[in-house]
């Protein structure tokens, strides 16, 4: 199937066109414009537990007012929680600065939205899909991939790639005037200094003033937590416990949650009271151009900290290393819209089976301001951390003796000798300078 047959560059008049409808200015104007130009628009809205959305049920009603043939609200929260837990289990986070990660909350949301909305469209025999993503961003490719994975007969029509739409409604002012001219009392909201996209797992703030690196996190008004950098905002230390069973978070502060959606919402409330999980990242988009974002993810951060504490106390060094390497690779695949590709499923299955299954236990933390926290206690029946093995005190039945360590160190002579030989080779070839004043002066001793 060639791109020319898949991507429609002009409006398919007389045909059903599904649109991912948010109720905002862009999708409202696009839906009405498509209707007036002769298409049959069908509106689909994903309920992702967006923290900045007050009334989900009002969105489909608004779509019908703008001329949709039908409008549906698709509850995606349970699937989003499932994918969020999978990302935690795999450590699927490749973007970080100074050890603080971006939890790929937007890519996770796109994986769920792209598959579930297109599945709903198939039920209505709608095989043309449009959304609000622009040609410069990541989402246009993510939705393209997930849409075609779900429905191989899908065709893509995006008003923002249609030159006629751009010529007639090229900006927010033109779209607002278009709605008013057609009898809709649309009052354009005051534009923020940045744009925000959110779901139950996290929020993304980017563009506009945030494109400039001298505009920092302080211009952002958090929607999932507090502005912890503001000294006038009171943030009190708080102890919280997180319990996992076979890699799945199941309880907060001793209270079990059968519904993972409710679990995430409570984790967001707890972490949000402190601004936990906020970060400022420069990242590489799919097309290899750099962008900048301010991110919130209080619940994901809380689960990630507790999960990794248990991972390090349960698994050996080689397993932890592989978990981290695979997590970086999987995070990038997730970011690229390949969360359901075979190479991603292989990495996911490895972590979920061999890492997560052993992660049972409870971690207690003290949360303070932002990403400032302390781990107070770690408990697990599977801990391989046994302090008596390395105790500096005299213990009965020691795991090993001084003579055992002498033998172990003696065996190291083999690779130390090999390393000295190689360093000599590097010196002779000019790669290393050995002897007096060099980094390794002792190697210049011919004796």
Swiss-Prot record:
| Positions of L-citrulline binding | 102, 138, 142, 195, 204, 206, 283
Q: Which Gene3D superfamilies match?
A: 1.10.287.400, Argininosuccinate synthetase, chain A, domain 2, HUPs
Q: Where, by residue number, does L-aspartate bind?
A: 134, 138-139
Recorded metabolic or biological pathway in which this protein acts: Amino-acid biosynthesis; L-arginine biosynthesis; L-arginine from L-ornithine and carbamoyl phosphate: step 2/3
What protein family is recorded?
A: Belongs to the argininosuccinate synthase family. Type 2 subfamily.
**Which SUPFAM superfamilies does this entry report, sorted A to Z?**
Adenine nucleotide alpha hydrolases-like (SSF52402), Argininosuccinate synthetase, C-terminal domain (SSF69864)
The catalysed reaction is: L-citrulline + L-aspartate + ATP = 2-(N(omega)-L-arginino)succinate + AMP + diphosphate + H(+)
Q: Where in the cell is it found?
A: Cytoplasm
- Descriptive protein name: Argininosuccinate synthase
List the GO biological process terms. Answer: argininosuccinate metabolic process; L-arginine biosynthetic process; urea cycle
Instruction: Describe its partners and assembly state.
Output: Homotetramer.
Keywords attached to this Swiss-Prot or TrEMBL record, sorted alphabetically, are: Amino-acid biosynthesis, Arginine biosynthesis, ATP-binding, Cytoplasm, Ligase, Nucleotide-binding
Write out the GO cellular component annotations.
cytoplasm
């Amino acid at each position: 199937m060639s791109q020319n047959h898949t991507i429609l560059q002009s409006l398919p008049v007389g045909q059903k066109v599904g649109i991912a409808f948010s109720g905002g200015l862009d999708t409202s104007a696009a839906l009405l414009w498509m209707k007036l130009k002769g298409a049959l628009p069908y509106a689909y809205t994903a309920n992702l537990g967006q923290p900045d959305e007050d009334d989900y049920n009002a969105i489909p009603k608004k779509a019908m007012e703008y001329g949709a043939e039908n409008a549906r609200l698709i509850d995606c929260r349970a699937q989003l929680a499932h994918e969020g837990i999978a990302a935690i289990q795999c450590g699927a986070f490749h973007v970080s600065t100074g050890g603080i990660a971006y939890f790929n909350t937007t890519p996770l949301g796109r994986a769920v939205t792209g598959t579930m909305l297109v599945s709903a469209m198939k039920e209505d025999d709608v095989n043309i899909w449009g959304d609000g993503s622009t040609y410069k961003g990541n989402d246009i490719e993510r939705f393209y991939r997930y849409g075609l994975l779900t429905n191989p007969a899908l065709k893509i029509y995006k008003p923002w790639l249609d030159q006629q739409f751009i010529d007639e409604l090229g900006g927010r002012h033109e779209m607002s005037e278009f709605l008013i001219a057609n009898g809709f009392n649309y009052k354009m909201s005051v534009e923020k200094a940045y744009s925000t996209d959110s779901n139950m797992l996290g929020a993304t703030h980017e563009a506009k003033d945030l494109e400039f690196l001298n505009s920092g996190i302080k211009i952002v008004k958090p929607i999932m937590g507090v502005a912890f950098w503001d000294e006038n905002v009171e943030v009190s230390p708080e102890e919280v416990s997180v319990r996992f069973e076979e890699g799945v978070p199941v309880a907060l502060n001793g209270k079990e949650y059968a519904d993972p959606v409710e679990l995430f919402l409570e984790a967001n409330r707890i972490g949000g009271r402190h601004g936990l999980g906020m970060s400022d990242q420069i990242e590489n988009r799919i097309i290899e151009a750099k962008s900048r974002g301010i991110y919130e993810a209080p619940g994901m951060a809380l689960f990630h900290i507790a999960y990794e504490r248990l991972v390090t106390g349960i698994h050996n060094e080689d397993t932890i290393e592989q978990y981290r390497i695979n997590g970086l690779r999987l995070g990038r695949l997730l970011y690229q819209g390949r969360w359901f590709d075979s190479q991603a499923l292989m990495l996911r299955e490895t972590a979920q089976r061999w890492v997560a299954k052993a992660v049972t236990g409870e971690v207690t933390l003290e949360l303070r301001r932002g990403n400032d926290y302390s781990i107070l206690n770690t408990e697990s029946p599977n801990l391989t951390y046994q302090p008596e093995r390395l105790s500096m005190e005299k213990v009965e039945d020691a795991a090993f003796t001084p003579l055992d360590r002498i033998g172990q160190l003696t065996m190291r002579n083999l690779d130390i000798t090999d390393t000295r030989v190689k360093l000599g080779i590097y010196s002779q070839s000019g790669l290393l300078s050995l002897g007096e004043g060099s980094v390794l002066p002792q190697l210049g001793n011919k004796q």
